[in-house]
Design a protein with these regions (language model features):
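Helix N-cap/coil-helix junction residues
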Residues: 78, 263-265, 326
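Amphipathic alpha-helical recognition patches that constitute DNA-binding helices
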Residues: 56, 67, 164, 249, ...
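Short helix/strand-capping connector loops at secondary-structure junctions
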Residues: 290-305
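C-terminal accessory extensions appended to soluble enzyme cores
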Residues: 304-330
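PAPS-dependent sulfotransferase catalytic domain
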Residues: 95, 99, 140-268, 279-283, ...
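PAPS-dependent sulfation machinery
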Residues: 70, 74-154, 159, 185-211, ...
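Post-kinase regulatory C-tail/linker adjacent to protein kinase catalytic domains
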Residues: 89, 273-280
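PAPS-dependent sulfotransferase catalytic core
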Residues: 2-127
Length: 330
């Protein structure tokens, strides 16, 4: 089996297990229960979770999604679903695991009969949400932080067209610089996953920094590109938030975001969560090079990337740079 296909299969299995929180196969009793279970209409609600009260956060890793989602999750009546990887589960398979010609094939499970399998994705998400949040408050909002599943953003938004979407953007040069620091031999990601790096299942940025920078730029283009595609196609409530604007005027940007999304929020409470999660309130021993909270300084890539690395990132991500940051393109 080709290495690429093998890696895709491994990712899909890991994603499914992580999403469903199971390690064993389905039992005979469970199979019988599933047979007896009535088929639920794809548009019905899951417990107290209303599809129109779901807010997705798509974009890229290292773009401030943890910060943004933490603030949103602290608002009364909001619940945070942190990285279910459901976008990665379906997106990796649909866009990377099979040839595009399969998408219109009559017998392919995610082929010609689109309404059927899109409806199944819808039920899959809502059933998962109901299982994970059994006591979800009536009228509450579910915030789904899914930057690393952005490759599946078009499928997620098609399955739940009533839901709302935040497209969180950050200069790809800063994203790559942050990723390189995290995956260097002294970085937090390396320390947390050291065995995977030593076994070769993850690549350290210290091994070949130039190749790593270009590779991360390609991943940014793929994931952020799909997130932008979903954003452009979505006909419901949506908002583009730039990390740089969030840093410069956090409270003002949060107010604009909630207003555009049509989500009511108490301004005093919003000010409280903004202050609570501010960069200044993060303990100093948790900030700095090699740590999860590194710089929070837009434009810091100028100090972190070599001219060659910056050029490579700009070349690879040029389509998105021109569209999202036209003022930064020479």
């Amino acid at each position: 089996m080709p290495a690429f296909k093998k890696n895709i299969i491994v990712e899909l299995v890991k994603g499914a297990r992580a999403y469903l929180k199971v390690d064993a196969g389905i039992t005979h009793r469970a199979r019988e229960e599933l047979k007896e279970r009535p088929v639920r209409d794809a548009g019905s609600e899951a417990g107290g979770i209303r599809p129109e009260n779901i807010v997705w956060i798509f974009g890229s890793g290292r773009s401030g999604s943890t910060w943004l989602s933490s603030m949103m999750g602290d608002i009364e009546g909001h619940s945070l679903w942190g990285e279910p990887w459901v976008g990665a589960l379906f997106g990796n398979y649909y866009y990377r695991g099979v040839h595009e010609r399969k998408h219109s094939a009559a017998h392919f499970i995610m082929g010609r009969h689109r309404d059927a399998w899109i409806g199944s994705i819808r039920n899959f998400i809502l059933d998962g949400a109901r299982a994970i949040f059994p006591a979800f408050p009536e009228g509450g909002y579910l915030i789904i932080k899914e930057p690393n599943g952005s490759i599946g953003a078009p499928l997620m938004m098609e399955a739940l067209p009533e839901s709302r979407m935040v497209l969180l953007a950050r200069d790809p040069r800063d994203v790559v610089a942050s990723s390189m620091d995290a995956r260097s031999e002294g970085g937090w990601n390396y320390k947390n996953n050291k065995s995977m790096y030593l076994e070769g299942r993850k690549k350290s940025s210290s091994d070949n920094p130039d190749a790593f920078a270009e590779g991360r730029a390609k991943r940014y283009l793929e994931g952020m590109g799909k997130a932008k595609e979903a954003y452009d196609a979505h006909r419901g409530r949506k908002v583009l938030i730039k990390y740089e604007e969030l840093r410069a005027n956090t409270l003002g940007t949060m107010k604009r975001m909630y207003s555009t999304l049509g989500v009511p929020v108490n301004e005093e409470e919003l000010a409280r969560v903004v202050e609570k999660h501010s960069w200044e309130n993060i303990p100093e021993n948790k900030k700095g090079e090699g740590k999860f909270y590194r710089k929070a300084s837009p434009g810091g890539w100028r100090e972190d990337l070599t001219p060659e690395q910056a050029e490579a990132v700009e070349r690879v991500t040029a389509p998105l740079l021109r569209e999202l940051y036209p003022e930064k393109v020479g």
